[in-house]
């Protein structure tokens, strides 16, 4: 069984207040002057003071083995801030730091360690505020208003580097080869790691490490680096520096899931909901020129227009990709929403998912068997549910303490307003009819004979995504649903958390004294007309799940207040994010894929055409991370996701899985 929690660091603080690993019997940083050693070994060893002003790209990527207390990262961040202040017009504008950590510190230990360096406090406090829970995989932290990105990969570095997507190859400008001393932690200092460092290093990229061990120098040379010794810091006689002077051949482990970006920095987004709003922000942060075309007269009139939506992860014991994606998407979403400089109604009150029948109880028991961190999810017994949620249900369940609810409509509107302040152009009542290639661009034809030409296009228009010739074969489907808006009562007002059962019920929004209860589910339907049957069924499902609960019987839907919307979904419950695949070319190129995997070409896609769709019923959870993934891909930057989970988001995945097994593929 796969476990989804990470073992925290086992440490103590010595007489000097320096953290010491009990497992490795080694200090996290020098007792003498760890800050100056970091500046000398890693910043100096990689010549960053000289390279920053001369860097020809807007992004500089640093990778590190062993995050530890974050001293190297914080020191680099401080130096990068000083560089930006001294060189505001430099080409280099953003810093991307990738680090691997098998045993992350707790937030409390991290804060205690940071007390050593008061001068780093402004940066350390931001790191502590966003410190992620101990889940495996990549945790992306957006710091300094997005100018600094930190990708924290929790797990064994030798395992993780073998799981990275090929899109990360040759992206790293500088390596910090750190960690406990080779004699103390030999399992990390392997040839596999050195080979991975070489694969990820950009031609001309550098490395520095505190050790001068001969096997390390030889291993890095064998991997492809040109190595040299340098005077060590303080009492250490020597250290190692290296440079990648050659261009190594790029491996391609799964060409059928290849992701391609664009050298252009101008894009049109088709949409008007949360997906297009968050993607606009992510692209603008990377220097793109972005135009949004919305078919409606205002934003968030589609599936993103609800008054309240629940935020919690979708978990399943039997689907590793789904667990990895949604657990990390959920934690990223909380960090993202908490730092968004816009207002929207929300309450991180927690979400409790209840076992209201034998099937749901079994499902919850399976989720709880996955060894989830308590920060993510904990079991709650039936007698404790009332204390936690405020209402009696006679059911046990699972609680997501960091979950809650938010207003998607308000979020979408205000994010788009923020994006407009940053340069986003929006055109409302522009219904895209079709699009075609013209002179290395996309020609967009709108209703009413309006036309526009753009270098790159992203389709983020929900259930209407498959209405174009390029997307008509996508295996997605529409789901119509109705959410009921009910006035609060004295009993309902006691509800303190979002309840999930065979439906969901939110606490009241203080702004309107109403709750949301829903939602009906009509697969294959796009009907948005009010339904009295749906209104009554929303109420009845609540009563059926909690037949002894008097408060449930008092739910009043008689005023017919409701909202009907249509979602876009997939049968595997995961979004579709990436290049729009070319269906016909895929069938031709991959006709013999099952027998000829070694000869496979890169996935056939439409050039400079991307999609961000099929968010289903968990868009509030998945949209922030999906926007970050797609913006990174489009910009040819590091993507915060391992290869197998990223493949599970690829729009061509359902076709490719069948083709890899030699099975026939049907459109839709």
From Swiss-Prot:
Its cofactor is FAD. GO terms for biological process: tRNA methylation; tRNA wobble uridine modification. Residues 270-668 are annotated as: FAD-dependent cmnm(5)s(2)U34 oxidoreductase. Gene3D superfamilies: D-Amino Acid Oxidase, subunit A, domain 2, FAD/NAD(P)-binding domain, Vaccinia Virus protein VP39. InterPro entries: FAD-dep_OxRdtase, FAD/NAD-bd_sf, MnmC-like_methylTransf, SAM-dependent_MTases_sf, tRNA_MAMT_biosynth_bifunc_MnmC, tRNA_MNMC2, tRNA_S-uridine_synth_MnmC_C. Changing residue 271 to Q: 4-fold decrease in activity, but no change in FAD binding. The keyword RNA-binding does not apply. It holds the Pfam family DAO. Its main location: cytoplasm. It is found in: Cytoplasm. Changing residue 178 to A: Strong decrease in methyltransferase activity. GO terms for molecular function: FAD binding; oxidoreductase activity, acting on the CH-NH group of donors; tRNA (5-methylaminomethyl-2-thiouridylate)(34)-methyltransferase activity. It catalyses: 5-aminomethyl-2-thiouridine(34) in tRNA + S-adenosyl-L-methionine = 5-methylaminomethyl-2-thiouridine(34) in tRNA + S-adenosyl-L-homocysteine + H(+). Its EC number is 2.1.1.61, 1.5.-.-. Keywords: Cytoplasm, FAD, Flavoprotein, Methyltransferase, Multifunctional enzyme, Oxidoreductase, S-adenosyl-L-methionine, Transferase, tRNA processing. Residues 1-245 are annotated as: tRNA (mnm(5)s(2)U34)-methyltransferase. Changing residue 180 to A: Strong decrease in methyltransferase activity. One of its GO terms (cellular component) is cytoplasm. In the N-terminal section; belongs to the methyltransferase superfamily. tRNA (mnm(5)s(2)U34)-methyltransferase family. HAMAP family: MnmC. Catalyzes the last two steps in the biosynthesis of 5-methylaminomethyl-2-thiouridine (mnm(5)s(2)U) at the wobble position (U34) in tRNA. Catalyzes the FAD-dependent demodification of cmnm(5)s(2)U34 to nm(5)s(2)U34, followed by the transfer of a methyl group from S-adenosyl-L-methionine to nm(5)s(2)U34, to form mnm(5)s(2)U34. NCBIfam families: MnmC_Cterm, PRK01747.1-1, PRK01747.1-2, PRK01747.1-3, PRK01747.1-5, tRNA_MNMC2. This is tRNA 5-methylaminomethyl-2-thiouridine biosynthesis bifunctional protein MnmC. It comes from Escherichia coli (strain K12). The gene is mnmC.
């Amino acid at each position: 069984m796969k476990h989804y929690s990470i073992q925290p660091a086992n440490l103590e603080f010595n007489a000097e207040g320096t953290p010491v690993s009990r497992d490795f019997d080694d200090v996290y940083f020098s007792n003498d002057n760890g800050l100056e050693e970091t500046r000398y070994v890693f910043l100096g060893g990689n010549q960053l003071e000289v390279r920053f002003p001369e860097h020809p790209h807007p992004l500089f990527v640093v990778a590190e083995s062993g995050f530890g207390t974050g001293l190297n990262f914080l020191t680099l961040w401080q130096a990068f801030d000083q560089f930006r202040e001294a060189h505001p017009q430099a080409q280099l504008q953003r810093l991307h730091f990738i680090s691997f950590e098998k045993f992350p510190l707790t937030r409390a230990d991290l804060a205690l360690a940071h007390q050593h360096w008061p001068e780093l406090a402004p940066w350390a406090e931001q790191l502590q505020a966003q410190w992620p829970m101990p889940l495996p995989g990549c945790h992306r932290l957006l710091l300094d208003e997005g100018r600094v990105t930190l990708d924290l990969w929790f797990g064994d570095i030798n395992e993780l580097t073998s799981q990275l997507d090929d899109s990360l190859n040759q992206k790293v400008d500088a390596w910090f080869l750190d960690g406990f001393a080779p004699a103390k932690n030999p399992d990390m200092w392997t040839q596999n790691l050195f080979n991975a460092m070489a694969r990820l290093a950009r031609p001309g990229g550098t490395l520095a490490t505190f050790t001068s061990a001969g096997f390390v120098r030889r291993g890095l040379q064998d991997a492809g680096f040109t190595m040299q010794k340098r005077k060590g810091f303080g009492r250490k006689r020597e250290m190692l520096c290296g440079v990648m002077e050659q261009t190594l051949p790029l491996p391609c482990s799964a060409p059928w899931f290849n992701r391609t970006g664009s050298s252009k920095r101008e894009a049109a987004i088709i949409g008007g909901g949360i997906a297009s709003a968050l993607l606009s922000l992510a692209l603008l942060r990377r220097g793109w020129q972005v135009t949004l075309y919305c078919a409606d007269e205002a934003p968030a009139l589609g599936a993103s227009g609800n008054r309240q939506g629940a935020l919690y992860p979708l978990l399943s014991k039997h689907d590793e990709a789904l667990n990895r994606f949604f657990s990390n998407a959920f934690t990223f979403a909380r960090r993202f929403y908490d730092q968004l400089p816009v207002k929207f109604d929300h309450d991180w009150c927690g979400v409790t998912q209840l076992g209201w029948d034998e099937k749901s109880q079994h499902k919850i028991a399976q989720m709880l068997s996955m060894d989830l961190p308590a920060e993510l999810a904990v079991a709650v017994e039936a007698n404790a549910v009332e204390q936690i949620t405020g209402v009696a249900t006679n059911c046990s369940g699972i609680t997501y303490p960091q979950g809650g609810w938010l207003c998607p409509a308000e979020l979408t509107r205000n994010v788009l307003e923020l994006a407009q302040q940053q340069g986003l152009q929006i055109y409302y009542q522009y219904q895209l009819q079709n699009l075609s290639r013209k002179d290395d661009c996309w020609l967009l034809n709108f209703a009413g004979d309006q036309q526009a030409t753009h270098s790159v296009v992203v389709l983020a228009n929900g259930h209407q995504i498959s209405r174009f010739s390029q997307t008509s074969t996508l295996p997605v489907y529409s789901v119509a649903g109705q959410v009921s808006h009910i006035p609060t009562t004295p009993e309902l007002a006691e509800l303190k958390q979002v309840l999930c059962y065979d439906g969901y019920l939110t606490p009241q929004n203080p702004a309107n004294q109403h709750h949301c209860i829903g939602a009906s589910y009509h697969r294959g339907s796009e009907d948005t007309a009010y339904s009295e049957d749906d209104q009554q069924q929303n109420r009845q499902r609540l009563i059926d799940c909690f037949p002894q609960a008097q408060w449930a019987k008092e739910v009043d839907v008689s005023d017919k207040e409701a909202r009907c919307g249509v979602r876009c979904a997939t049968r595997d419950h995961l979004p579709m994010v990436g290049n729009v695949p070319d269906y016909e070319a895929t069938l031709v190129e991959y006709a013999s894929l099952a027998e000829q995997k070694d000869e496979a070409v890169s996935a056939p896609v439409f050039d400079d055409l991307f999609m961000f769709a099929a968010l289903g019923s968990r868009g509030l959870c998945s949209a922030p991370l999906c926007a970050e993934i797609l913006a990174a891909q489009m910009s040819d930057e590091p993507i915060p996701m391992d290869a197998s989970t990223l493949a599970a988001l690829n729009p061509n995945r359902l076709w490719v899985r069948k083709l890899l097994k030699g099975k026939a593929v049907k459109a839709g």
